[in-house]
């Protein structure tokens, strides 16, 4: 029997899902137990939805409601600074990555340029 991983989804996976990318739907289905996102991911997705008008904004809010929203705590902030310095990633990516690490979750992304390749980040597909 497989033990389900506790997942934290990167912004690109959620945007792919909202854009109808089948691989994103598969990943969200596979890691459906207690899925989480960073507050940064919530903000990034909602900024895009708000530009599309009230109907899509509401639909997106409802979609995001299925995820546990993890805050930027002091511990996440400290870890993000370390990751930003040591891994040379953009600050929003460092915060998302730190949120996963502090919460003992597997970060699921499809963008190796954001996180490198040998780093514990799961990249189930690429576009």
Task: Please describe what each predicted stretch is.
Residues 86-92:
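Donor nucleotide-sugar recognition loop
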Residues 65-86:
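Acidic catalytic patch
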Residues 1-37, 47-61:
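Short, well-structured N-terminal submotif of metal-dependent ribonuclease cores
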Residues 33-35, 65-68, 101-106:
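Short active-site oxyanion
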Residues 1-4, 97-127:
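Acidic, PIN/NYN-like endoribonuclease modules and their adjacent C-terminal/linker elements
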Residues 10-11, 45, 80, 100:
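Generic structural signal for small/hydrophobic residues in well-ordered secondary structure
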Residues 13-14, 41, 76, 95-96, ...:
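Alpha-helix capping/helix-boundary segments
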């Amino acid at each position: 029997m497989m033990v389900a991983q506790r997942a934290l989804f990167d912004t690109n996976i959620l945007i792919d899902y909202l854009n109808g990318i089948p691989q994103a739907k598969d990943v969200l289905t596979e890691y459906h137990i207690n899925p989480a996102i960073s507050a940064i991911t919530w903000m990034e997705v909602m900024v895009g939805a708000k530009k599309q008008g009230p109907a899509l904004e509401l639909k997106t809010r409802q979609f995001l409601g299925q995820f546990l929203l993890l805050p930027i705590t002091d511990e996440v902030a400290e870890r993000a600074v370390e990751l930003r310095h040591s891994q040379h990633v953009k600050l929003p990516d460092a915060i998302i990555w730190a949120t996963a690490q502090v919460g003992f979750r597997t970060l699921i992304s499809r963008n190796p340029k954001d996180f490198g390749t040998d780093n514990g980040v799961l990249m189930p597909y690429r576009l």
